[in-house]
């Protein structure tokens, strides 16, 4: 069957047990798409929002890789495991003597910039080899702490020893490690039992669709699920160009900000999304030093 040149963004609700790449391949087959990519992996043991990019949208997937993420997670206090989640072997168990007030206080301590040591069971590489390969061989290698930012951390429910929380965090944050560190702060240890991603940058789980629902849908129904390419860029200020400026922009020319009908509402050096007079997305540019410099262009005007 012929592949289709599709442009857009699919908000997929990935199930537990499926890798991000397998989810992408299934969606790509269902859409018969020529080109597709995801915006950063979601662990097989995690469920939730996995934005998939088709066609021209793949040019902007890096923006979501850099974006903050929001998760809902459940940790079990009193039990530490080798992997930091329910898949690992139990390392030790301890009594849970804290109450809800202590849990709330512990969560509050982790808001802001924190330093995390990446877990051994992770895809980070050391000497070209993923850390999880060392871990599976029973080896532990030294890892440097990394600074990440916890934007928000709120208690959802507390049914000790199980605690469910919602966290919004910067790129590179390990929620498993966060749960373990909170457990240590409470003096009893912890491991993650559930992880569900509910937000990636400006995108949310609210309008996501499952693979089963896509499988049962008609092609027209599936296509209607695709958000436009600029769904990835909704936080960027908007610039509109007249026909002459749009032509120059699409040829990669830098435009003087003084030539624009309205200056972009962006900080110096800020990125903006650029449209023509018919509201067709032309691409992304950077407004800096009095010029609008094309950064990524949309070929099809998706």
Curated annotation (Swiss-Prot):
Catalytic activity: uridine(55) in tRNA = pseudouridine(55) in tRNA
Coiled coil stretches, renumbered: none
E.C. code: 5.4.99.25
Record Pfam families: TruB-C_2 (PF09157), TruB_C_2 (PF16198), TruB_N (PF01509)
SUPFAM superfamilies, A to Z: Pseudouridine synthase (SSF55120), PUA domain-like (SSF88697)
Protein name: tRNA pseudouridine synthase B
Enzyme class: isomerase
Family: Belongs to the pseudouridine synthase TruB family. Type 1 subfamily.
Biological process, per Gene Ontology: mRNA pseudouridine synthesis; tRNA pseudouridine synthesis
Function: Responsible for synthesis of pseudouridine from uracil-55 in the psi GC loop of transfer RNAs.
UniProtKB keywords: Isomerase, tRNA processing
Active site: 43 (nucleophile)
GO molecular function: RNA binding; tRNA pseudouridine(55) synthase activity
Gene name tied to this protein: truB
């Amino acid at each position: 069957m012929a592949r289709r040149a599709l442009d857009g963004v699919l908000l997929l609700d990935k199930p537990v047990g499926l890798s991000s790449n397998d989810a992408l391949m299934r969606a790509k087959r269902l859409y018969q798409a020529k080109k597709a990519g995801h915006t950063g992996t979601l662990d097989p043991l995690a469920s939730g929002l996995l934005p998939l990019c088709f066609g021209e949208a793949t040019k902007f997937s890096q923006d979501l890789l850099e974006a903050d993420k929001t998760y809902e997670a459940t940790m079990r206090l009193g039990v530490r495991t080798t992997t930091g989640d329910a898949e690992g072997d139990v390392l030790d168990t301890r009594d849970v003597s804290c109450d809800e007030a202590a849990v709330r206080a512990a969560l509050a301590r982790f808001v802001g910039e924190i330093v995390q040591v990446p877990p051994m069971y992770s895809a980070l590489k050391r000497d070209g080899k993923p850390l999880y390969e060392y871990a599976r061989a029973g080896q532990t290698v030294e890892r440097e702490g990394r600074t990440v930012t916890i934007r928000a951390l709120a208690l959802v429910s507390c049914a000790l020893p199980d605690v469910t929380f919602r966290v919004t965090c910067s790129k590179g944050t390990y929620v498993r490690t966060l749960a373990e560190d909170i457990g240590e702060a409470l003096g009893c240890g912890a491991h993650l039992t559930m992880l569900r991603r509910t937000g990636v940058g400006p995108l949310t789980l609210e309008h996501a669709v499952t693979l089963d629902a896509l499988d049962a849908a008609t092609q027209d129904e599936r296509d209607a699920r695709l958000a436009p390419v600029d769904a990835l860029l909704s936080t960027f200020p908007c610039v509109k160009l007249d026909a002459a400026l749009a032509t120059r922009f699409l040829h990669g020319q830098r435009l003087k900000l003084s030539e624009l009908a309205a200056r972009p509402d962006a900080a110096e050096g800020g990125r903006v999304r650029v449209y023509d007079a018919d509201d067709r997305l032309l691409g992304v540019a950077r407004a800096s030093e009095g010029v609008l410099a094309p950064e990524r262009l949309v070929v099809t005007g998706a």
